[in-house]
């Protein structure tokens, strides 16, 4: 995936071509000079134009490695728009103008020579003019470096080169006069053959000698350049204060960045956002400023850090590039004008879901088994747990087992081991023949492999070093990774970042069946280069652990710079090692990049350890407080004022002596105290009235300055807002208008309400707001409290009724391996401890029947069930379900039993046997439900609705014809029972009002019900329906295990065929049934729907906290 953005450029100019043209021109001369110094053929081919250029335009000796090297550096600097290169070229051109003018003024030149001088003068004047006009385009500076040290190396190198060259000329002088040999050597070594050879008497020395003299100068220049470039990196590397600031940012914001800790690698440089809350670490290679990973720090400050980094790139003429950015980081760089391309994927393991079981982990499982059989055990320690001697041994192993001369890595490697600042790093060792068994016990075995992982936030680890001895058994690495995941909980690790797999998608796509020729060719190339760079090996070593793949991106400014950024990345990561690169050298910079105010605060440490976090939070992480409504801000200010005065706004509670309702009925001379929420306040100066509500009711408080023992009513007004919780103590009495009131002597605040209550008269009028803020609805709305009481009364009445009949209440599992007991779509979840998919139960039926088999003759469960179905006024995904089973009974027994349960519940909630039903005007009116209820068969009820007689023997074509006539849809694969059930639901259930029992359902739609004892084709089952809502169902339970198995197998076939509501085959339940269950009548009742009809409200209104769609 590639994210592109418009390229960032400075203001365009008519002379923008000058830097590139100057660089190319000088570069061509440098290239030709180098080739001519090596090849006599090329030197002969370009002799004539070279001599013209050398005489009149630009110094171009026949052989000079030194001059070629100088010009190469100058060409690169000009192309990079370095200001110092502009000055050098300008001064050279100005000097050349002077030389040409001087030669013309002497007047002793031939006509041809004068023409050459004029051409050269014109070229130099034009070059000076264009360079002056293009001066603003050469803005780039040069980084600080050890300039004097480099100059000393250059001087010493040149001196040695001149002396060696002088000696060489003494040995092979040709016809060169002795007096000129030293000067000739100096001209060739450090004057770049700038003096005309004709100035020296005698014939020139052999061309090989000239080439060697130029090579001596080139070597001196190279040595000086190497010293300068290396000093630039070391001078500008991280200082202790920089590293300390980075560690502080990582502690504050680094919990999501698996590569964040690698920002402390000490051969990197750093640039901070101006506010110090974010930073970017980078390294400069081949003119590319290569940032490693995401910015470190507050994501809100990433744009400022990126802007500072890009400004730095512009200052020094570097091309910006990024290696290993995450999706969020790539988006941030893209917003700053860079483009991004997916580089590969990082392998993330989650130990809580890591298992060696399963076919996908077979290879790892077998490798682990082999390693264990070889006697390998794993030891895991923090670096701080190792003694200096033990750490020295670890470092020795890491160096000895490294398969390259230098350590690789840049964006995903730390580059050091054993530093005291890295004490939180993890060390995982594979030990062969170890006798110790503890995690941190050094044991007595031989270490054969090791992993070192750096911290990833507070609960993660990111792989830094992986080493194994050539003598380690096969499977050692797999064993270490597996044991790390298995023991992760003990060491506080919840996520592990393994190696980075570059071009992972290319390997996968190229290996797929039907991959195109381009994909296969690209994969072949990657496999070919993997012989040296281990691309495929890293991919396969990660893939076998079944990790989560997290994409990482490379960012660049312009598509033309992709090859250059790629080369810089290859050099930085260590795949291409340049001479004298000193990758293993630890740097400590000399110029702190952290903001000066942060350095001056004193929180940073010189040794690079994490800073004082309290000071760092104050200085760098002071986020703006969230914007709050005005009333909330006022209340917050009042809370702070109270706390400043020593008032505890949230004290420890103490039970009040009376409820509000009891206080109203108490005698006047009894001192009492009440507690509740203030709903209204009326202030009349020295007298104040407040309405206090608790769960029992309301009481009016009367505060009078003359009766208050301490403080005044003004103190109450200043401290208390509507909604606050208070305690008040006093005696009962009457106000002047005769209202029964608590005459308050003293009071205290027990809970400050920081958000205003809704309108004191209307309350919460929006139904959605009432659902989402039920706590507020309960605080201000007596109707909401009545519904809570009614629901509690219904549950209590159901339990009491069953208890009095001798039923035993039990609890069965909510998490179930097989969904059964009803035809419904289940919720699926997963248990990490057993790596097992589970269902939230749709019904407790199958477990309750197991209890019946065990001899529990009267049993019930009143609890929660879950069905992943629609939500409406009568359906909720999570609901309360009653299931009860009575041995030696049938479904007829439960007709009276169910009616009694509901009537008792109605009595508990409403005080009489009534349902509340809304009239046309919305007012609820009671509907009597006392006495017996109507009982009908399903076929009789459908016949009444159709006007045509049907029964269990009616054939399918006839039923379809009747359904078509009634406009009832059906599916072609349905049998007779399913068609009858569909007509029943549309024509009977939806139109039923008074509570009615519909019995004897078709057998095919009742898989857990026994067949009717006398009527073929129907089952002993009834449904209770009232006002279009199914309230309950009861069965004469199927106890025949053979028939039960046949029906459940049919259901399992439907489930295998894609029916999400069909029950799965529960073999354990079937085995239980084979031990024989007594004849049993079972009842299932939806308690939420019963409460709904008793109270006249929807299910959402009767539930304290119904499921609400996210805002």
From Swiss-Prot:
InterPro entries: Aa-tRNA-synt_II (IPR004364), aa-tRNA-synth_II (IPR006195), aa-tRNA-synth_II/BPL/LPL (IPR045864), LPG_synthase_C (IPR024320), Lys-tRNA-ligase_II (IPR002313), Lys-tRNA-ligase_II_N (IPR044136), Lys-tRNA-synth_II_C (IPR018149), NA-bd_OB-fold (IPR012340). Keywords: Aminoacyl-tRNA synthetase, Antibiotic resistance, ATP-binding, Cell membrane, DNA-binding, Ligase, Lipid metabolism, Magnesium, Membrane, Metal-binding, Multifunctional enzyme, Nucleotide-binding, Transferase, Transmembrane, Transmembrane helix. Its main location: membrane. PANTHER family: LYSINE--TRNA LIGASE, CHLOROPLASTIC_MITOCHONDRIAL, LYSYL-TRNA SYNTHETASE. GO terms for biological process: lipid metabolic process; lysyl-tRNA aminoacylation; response to antibiotic. It comes from the Bacteria. In the N-terminal section; belongs to the LPG synthetase family. Residues 674-747 bind DNA. Residues 613-1111 are annotated as: Lysine--tRNA ligase. This is Lysylphosphatidylglycerol biosynthesis bifunctional protein LysX. It catalyses: tRNA(Lys) + L-lysine + ATP = L-lysyl-tRNA(Lys) + AMP + diphosphate; L-lysyl-tRNA(Lys) + a 1,2-diacyl-sn-glycero-3-phospho-(1'-sn-glycerol) = a 1,2-diacyl-sn-glycero-3-phospho-1'-(3'-O-L-lysyl)-sn-glycerol + tRNA(Lys). The lineage of its organism: Bacteria, Bacillati, Actinomycetota, Actinomycetes, Mycobacteriales. The chain crosses the membrane at residues 18-38, 60-80, 84-104, 118-138, 152-172, 209-229, 308-328.
């Amino acid at each position: 995936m590639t994210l592109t953005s418009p390229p960032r450029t400075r203001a365009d100019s008519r002379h923008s071509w000058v830097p590139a043209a100057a660089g190319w021109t000088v570069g061509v001369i440098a290239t030709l000079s180098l080739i001519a110094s090596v090849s006599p053929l090329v030197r002969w081919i370009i002799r004539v134009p070279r001599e013209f250029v050398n005489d009149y335009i630009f110094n171009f000796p026949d052989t000079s490695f030194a001059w070629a090297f100088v010009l190469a550096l100058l060409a690169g600097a000009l192309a990079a728009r370095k200001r110092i290169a502009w000055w050098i070229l300008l001064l050279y051109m100005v000097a050349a103008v002077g030389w040409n003018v001087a030669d013309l003024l002497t007047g002793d030149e031939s006509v041809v020579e004068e023409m050459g001088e004029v051409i050269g003068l014109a070229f130099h004047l034009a070059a000076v003019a264009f360079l002056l006009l293009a001066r603003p385009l050469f803005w780039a500076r040069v980084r600080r470096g050890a300039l004097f040290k480099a100059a000393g190396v250059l001087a010493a190198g040149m001196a040695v080169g001149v002396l060696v060259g002088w000696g060489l000329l003494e040995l092979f002088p040709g016809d060169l006069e002795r007096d000129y040999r030293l000067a000739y050597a100096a001209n060739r070594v450090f004057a770049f053959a700038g003096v005309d050879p004709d100035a020296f008497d005698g014939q020139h020395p052999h061309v090989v000698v000239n080439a060697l003299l130029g090579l001596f100068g080139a070597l001196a220049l190279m040595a000086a350049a190497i010293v300068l470039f290396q000093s630039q990196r070391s001078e500008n590397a991280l200082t202790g204060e920089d590293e300390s600031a980075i560690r502080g940012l990582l502690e504050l914001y680094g919990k999501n960045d698996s590569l964040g800790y690698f920002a402390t690698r000490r051969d990197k440089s750093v640039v901070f956002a101006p506010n110090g809350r974010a930073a970017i670490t980078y390294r400069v290679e081949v003119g590319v400023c290569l940032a490693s990973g995401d910015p470190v720090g507050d994501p809100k400050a990433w744009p400022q850090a990126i802007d500072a980094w890009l400004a730095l790139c512009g200052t020094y003429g570097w091309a910006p590039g990024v290696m290993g950015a995450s999706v969020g980081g790539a988006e941030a760089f893209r917003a700053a004008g860079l483009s991004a391309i997916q580089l590969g994927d990082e392998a993330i393991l989650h130990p809580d879901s890591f298992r060696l079981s399963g076919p996908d982990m077979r290879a790892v499982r077998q490798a682990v088994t082999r390693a264990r059989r070889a006697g390998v055990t794993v030891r895991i320690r923090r670096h701080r747990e190792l003694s200096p001697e033990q750490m020295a041994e670890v470092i020795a192993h890491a160096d000895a087992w490294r398969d390259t001369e230098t350590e690789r890595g840049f964006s995903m490697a730390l580059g050091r081991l054993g530093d005291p600042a890295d004490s939180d790093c993890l060390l995982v060792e594979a030990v062969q023949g170890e006798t110790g068994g503890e995690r941190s016990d050094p044991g007595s075995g031989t270490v054969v492999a090791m992993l070192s992982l750096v911290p990833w936030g507070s609960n993660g680890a990111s792989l830094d070093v992986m080493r194994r001895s050539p003598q380690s058994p096969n499977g050692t690495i797999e064993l270490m990774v597996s044991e790390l995941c298995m023991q992760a909980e003990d060491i506080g690790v919840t996520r592990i970042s393994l190696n980075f797999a570059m071009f992972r998608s290319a390997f996968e796509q190229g290996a797929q069946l039907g991959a195109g020729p381009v994909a296969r060719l690209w994969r072949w190339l990657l496999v070919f280069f993997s012989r040296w760079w281990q691309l495929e090996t890293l991919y396969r070593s990660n893939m076998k652990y079944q990790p989560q793949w997290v994409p990482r991106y490379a960012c660049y400014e312009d598509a033309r710079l992709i090859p250059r950024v790629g080369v810089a990345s290859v050099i930085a990561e260590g795949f291409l090692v340049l001479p004298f690169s000193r990758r293993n050298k630890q740097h400590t910079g000399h110029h702190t990049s952290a903001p000066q105010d942060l350095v001056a605060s004193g929180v940073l440490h010189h040794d690079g350890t994490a800073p004082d976090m309290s000071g760092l939070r104050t200085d760098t992480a002071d986020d703006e407080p969230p914007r709050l409504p005005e009333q909330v801000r006022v209340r917050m200010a009042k809370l702070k004022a109270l706390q400043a005065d020593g008032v505890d706004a949230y004290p420890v509670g103490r039970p009040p002596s009376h409820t509000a309702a009891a206080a109203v009925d108490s005698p006047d001379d009894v001192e009492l105290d009440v507690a509740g929420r203030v709903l209204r306040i009326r202030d009349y100066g020295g007298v104040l009235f407040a309405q206090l509500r608790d769960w029992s009711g309301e009481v009016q408080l009367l505060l009078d300055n003359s009766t208050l023992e301490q403080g005044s009513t003004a103190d109450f007004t200043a401290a208390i807002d509507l909604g606050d919780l208070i305690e008040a103590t006093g005696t009962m009495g009457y106000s002047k208008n005769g209202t029964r009131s608590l005459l308050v002597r003293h009071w205290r605040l027990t809970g400050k309400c920081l958000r205003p209550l809704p309108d004191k008269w209307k309350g919460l009028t929006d139904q959605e707001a009432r659902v989402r803020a039920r706590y507020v609805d309960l605080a201000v709305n007596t109707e909401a409290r009545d519904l809570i009481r009614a629901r509690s009364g219904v549950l209590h009445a159901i339990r009491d009724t069953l208890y009095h009949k001798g039923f035993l209440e039990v609890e069965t599992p909510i998490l179930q391996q097989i969904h059964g007991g009803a035809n419904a779509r289940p919720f699926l979840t997963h248990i990490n401890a057993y790596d097992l998919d589970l269902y939230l139960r749709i019904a407790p039926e199958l477990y309750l029947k197991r209890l019946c088999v065990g001899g529990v003759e009267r049993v019930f469960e009143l609890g929660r069930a879950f069905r992943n179905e629609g939500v409406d006024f009568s359906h909720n995904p999570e609901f309360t379900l009653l299931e009860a089973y009575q041995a030696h009974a049938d479904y007829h027994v439960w007709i009276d039993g169910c009616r009694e349960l509901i009537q008792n519940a109605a009595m508990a909630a409403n005080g009489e046997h009534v349902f509340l039903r809304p009239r046309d005007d919305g007012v609820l009116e009671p509907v009597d439900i006392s006495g017996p209820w109507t009982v009908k068969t399903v076929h009789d009820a459908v016949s009444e609705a159709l006007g045509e007689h049907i029964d269990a023997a009616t054939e399918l074509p006839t039923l379809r014809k009747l359904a078509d006539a009634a406009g009832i849809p059906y599916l072609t694969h349905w049998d007779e029972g399913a068609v009858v059930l569909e007509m029943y639901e549309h024509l009977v259930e939806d139109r039923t009002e008074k509570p009615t029992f519909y019995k004897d359902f078709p057998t095919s739609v009742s898989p857990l019900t026994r067949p009717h004892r006398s009527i073929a084709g129907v089952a002993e089952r009834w449904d209770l329906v009232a006002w279009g809502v199914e309230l309950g169902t009861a069965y004469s339970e199927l106890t025949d295990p053979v028939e039960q198995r046949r029906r459940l197998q049919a259901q399992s076939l439907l489930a295998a065929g894609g029916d999400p509501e069909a029950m799965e085959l529960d073999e354990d339940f079937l085995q239980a049934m084979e031990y024989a269950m007594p004849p049993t009548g079972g009842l299932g009742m939806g308690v939420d729907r019963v409460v709904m009809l008793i109270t006249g409200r929807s299910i959402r209104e009767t539930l304290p906290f119904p499921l609400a769609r996210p805002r």
